[in-house]
Amino acid sequence: MTTIESKCSIDGILLLNKPQGMTSNAALQKAKHLFGAKKAGHTGSLDPLATGMLPLCFGEATKICQYLLNADKSYETIGRLGSKTNTADCTGEVIFCIENYTVSHEELIATLEKYKGKTKQIPSMFSALKHKGTPLYRLAREGIEIERKARDIVISQLKLEQFDGECFTLTVSCSKGTYIRNLVEDIGDTLKAGAHMTKLHRLYTAGFENNRMYTLDELQDMPLSQRLACLIPIDQAVQHLTPVILSDSEVTAIRQGKVISNKTSAVEGEDLRLYGEQSQFIGIGQALIHGDIKAKRLVSFAL
C-alpha cells in the first residue's frame, strides 16, 4: 500500500464505492489519508447499511460540493414485505409484523405508480437531519420523537426489477433529500403489508452516470500515480451549467472582485462555469442584468 506521508495539495473529485458497514465520514477519512489531502468533504452521506457512489471532494473541489448535494441520485434497493422496523431498514427493531398477507405483482406495480413524480415525504427520525443542532437519529435513540414536516420530493423513475411475493427490488431515481427506506416503508403501508429496506446501493449521482467508482481496497493496492489518476476534474461536477470563456484580463479582473460587463445572455441569477482562454476552469460565476457576470465561487489555481 502506498500512502502520501505528508499532507499536500490534492484537488479533484473521487467517486468512492462506499462499503457496507462504514459511515460516510469514516470512508472520507480513509480516502483522505490515502491521498494525503489537506482538505476533503463528501457530498451527501450514505447510511452505514448502504453501498455505492459517494463523491468525495478534495482541495479546491470542496468549493463545489453544494452542487453535488443538490444533484439527483439513482439507487437500487430491496424491500421486504411483512414487517416494519423503527428505522425502516433491517438494522432496526421490528415494530410490526404480519404473516398472512398476499400482494400480487399487479398490486405492487399499481402502488409504485402512486409514488412517481412530485410527492411529499416525512423524513424518518433515524436520519441525519438536525433539530436545534442535534441529529434526529440521536434523539430517536433516546426515545425522543420530534414532529417533522413533509418535504417535497420528485421521483423520476421507480421501476420494479424483481418480486418474489415477499422481497422486491427497485431502481429509483429521485431528487435530493429523498429517503429510500421511507419510500420502501410507505409502499408497504399502502399495500397494508408493512415493509422495510434490506439493501441500498447508490448507482450514481447525476453528472457521473458513466464514471467508474473505486473501492478503498482498490485504491490501497494502487501505486500513487495510478491513485491520483482516479481523480475527476472539478468542473465535471457542474457540466449542467452554461460555460463562459473569459480573456486573461477578464480572469484577472474577476479574481479581483470586479464585474465583467456584457459577457453572457444567461438569465439574471443563473450560475455559470467560467474558463480562461486556455480552457482552464476558473470557478463559478453568476449572471447579472445586462449580461454582466460576477464571481460566485472561484478556485484558487489554474487547472
From Swiss-Prot:
GO terms for molecular function: RNA binding; tRNA pseudouridine(55) synthase activity. The active site is at 47 (nucleophile). It catalyses: uridine(55) in tRNA = pseudouridine(55) in tRNA. GO terms for biological process: mRNA pseudouridine synthesis; tRNA pseudouridine synthesis. SUPFAM superfamilies: Pseudouridine synthase (SSF55120), PUA domain-like (SSF88697). The keyword Isomerase applies. The keyword Transcription does not apply. Its EC number is 5.4.99.25. InterPro entries: PsdUridine_synth_cat_dom_sf, PsdUridine_synth_N, PUA-like_sf, PUA_sf, tRNA_psdUridine_synth_TruB, tRNA_sdUridine_synth_fam1_C, TruB_C. Keywords: Isomerase, tRNA processing. Gene3D superfamilies: Pseudouridine synthase (3.30.2350.10), PUA domain (2.30.130.10). It is an enzyme of class 5 (isomerase). Belongs to the pseudouridine synthase TruB family. Type 1 subfamily. HAMAP family: TruB_bact. Responsible for synthesis of pseudouridine from uracil-55 in the psi GC loop of transfer RNAs. This is tRNA pseudouridine synthase B. It comes from Legionella pneumophila (strain Lens).
